[in-house]
Amino acid sequence: MKKRVLILCTGNSARSQMAEGLWRHEAGGRFDVFSAGTKPTKVRPEAIAVMKELGIDISGHRLKSVDEFLGQEFDYVITVCDHANEICPVFPGKTQRLHWPFEDPTDEASFRQIRDQIRARIHSFVA
């Protein structure tokens, strides 16, 4: 049975979207991975662009609110920003909650930097 992972940030616009795409790419289908936001906005074009550089297309990802996942069981709930960590809801079952804080990217260079940091973290986790 696949492990279920939910990645949370505030806007579900950059860090969590990149993490979802990277996790799916790195894990080769061994996990069911979702991302969501506490206050979803829109996927940032910079996130789409820097992921495309790696051959990962997140342009079809839709924004999701954490509310869509309340009551579901996950093996891991990972927050990637401090705000999401502070207000992360409780999920049923034996969910392991992890906090991987990443800075909010502001320009294309910082999007690449954060993407690479997230990728390294995921790679070491799923290896």
Residue map of PLM features:
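Mid-chain, well-packed structural core segment of small domains
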Residues: 61, 67-92
